[in-house]
Design a protein with these regions (language model features):
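C-terminal-of-GTPase-core extension/linker across diverse P-loop GTPases
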Residues: 1-6, 11, 17, 152-389, ...
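Conserved G1/Walker A P-loop phosphate-binding module
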Residues: 1-161, 172-174, 214, 218
Length: 397
């Protein structure tokens, strides 16, 4: 699963991406060795089951800090988007190509209203940031509709083409965007389309695309620059749009992570506050800057919002849960004796069989049954996983 960071120029998109991917929690032996220039690794933060079990864990694919698991996830930094991107304006084509790979989107909005629709600086509060949400949605839908409409008249007028065959055609055309057949079926129902596909108008298909965009590219709004005075009222207006909205100060998060990197403060992404290290020698400017972050961001908002955006994208938009596969269900270890070695993200509603196949194809294909490591109960391959499950898979040798 990958999440795309999107937004117009100067909204703080690059700052958000830099803050989210500046590692302050060391992860040893993580399998990614190279990341493309516009790719980065960030981390989900979730309560680890080690405290509940009263054990000292030894994570391999993630890190546990004071009972909090930090699980690596991949972010895509999409180029800044301006109106007309769907027709190739600006870096539109590159943006849309990157977007194909994203399963969900975090839309960075300049909540202060100090940049116009193309990202050019303006007076604070002069621009309505709600308009930025609408233009991005329209560009995405225009792009999807272009793909769908290619030769549509010819295809839809094909002798005897049924709505069921139209579903197959649409799903195949949009498969590169991550669109699934069931999503097309749902979108057609929501749009109220029945009968002959040849009778569906461009407006009809436009309604279908609107529902498909929400399903295939779910989006949350990061209302950035929350520390600026003109942002407060705008955040309320943005929230009334109906989208999942998180108040954010990407600049504050980046400053805090850089301070950690320099050994000046103790801070974990998502914390409500920081503490200055006893050995740190802060300049008056550094001390004033940190206090400003505390006063204008952390105290009123409870956090910078960056970590909440990452968590919400995966846990709310993509409906992911965390499970802990182990080899020894009695000691909660892998074959090397590491306690709770892996925290794996998987879709809510996934079965034990799907988890086994995810771990290794051979394990899934040879699976006999599973074991609930919390109580020793035997589990069938159709067992539906819950967040926090600790499970062992038994397979034929």
């Amino acid at each position: 699963m990958q999440v795309g960071i999107v937004g117009k120029p100067n909204a703080g998109k690059s700052t958000f991406f830099s803050a989210a991917t500046l590692t302050v929690v060391a992860i040893a032996n993580y399998p990614f060795t190279t990341i493309k220039p516009n790719r980065g690794i960030s981390y989900l933060r979730t309560r680890c089951v080690c405290r509940e079990l009263g054990v000292q864990d030894q994570p391999k694919n993630s890190r546990c800090v004071d009972g909090e698991r930090f699980i690596p996830v991949e972010l895509i930094d999409c180029p800044g988007l301006v109106p007309g991107a769907s027709t190739g304006r600006g870096l539109g084509n590159q943006f849309l190509d990157d977007l194909r790979k994203a399963d969900a989107l975090i839309h960075i909005i300049d909540a202060s209203g100090s940049t116009d629709s193309e990202g050019k600086p303006s007076a604070a509060g002069a621009h309505n940031p709600v308009e930025d949400i609408g233009f991005l949605e329209k560009e995405l839908e225009a792009w999807i509709l272009q793909i769908l409409l290619k030769d549509w008249d010819k295809v839809s007028r094909k002798t005897g083409l049924t709505s069921e065959e139209a579903v197959e055609t649409m799903a195949e055309r949009l498969s590169g965007l991550g669109v699934k057949k069931f999503q097309v079926e749902d979108a057609l129902k929501l749009a109220g389309l029945r009968g002959k596909p040849s009778e569906w108008s461009r407006e009809d298909l436009g309604r279908v695309v609107g529902f498909l965009r929400r399903a295939a590219k779910p989006m949350l709004i990061a209302a950035n620059k929350i520390d600026l005075p003109s942002s407060k009222e705008n955040v309320t207006r943005i929230g009334q749009n109906g989208s999942l909205t998180v108040p954010v100060s990407a600049e504050a998060e980046l400053a805090l992570r850089r301070a950690v990197e320099k050994g000046l403060i103790s801070y974990r992404p998502g914390d409500p506050d920081f503490s200055v290290n006893a050995s740190a020698r802060l300049t008056p400017e550094q001390r004033a800057g940190l206090e400003m972050i505390r006063k204008q961001v952390l105290a009123p908002e409870g956090a910078t919002g960056v970590q909440e955006c990452i968590n919400s994208a995966f846990f709310k938009l993509l409906d992911m849960i965390v499970v802990y596969p182990v080899e020894d269900p009695e000691r909660w270890t892998d074959h090397s004796g590491n306690v709770l070695p892996d925290a794996i993200l998987i879709r809510k509603g996934s079965t034990l069989k799907e988890l086994a196949l995810r771990i290794h194809t051979d394990l899934g294909e040879r699976m006999l049954y599973g074991v609930n490591a919390r109580n020793g109960m035997r589990l069938g391959d159709s067992y539906v996983l819950s967040s926090g499950d600790i499970v062992s898979v038994v397979s034929a040798s």
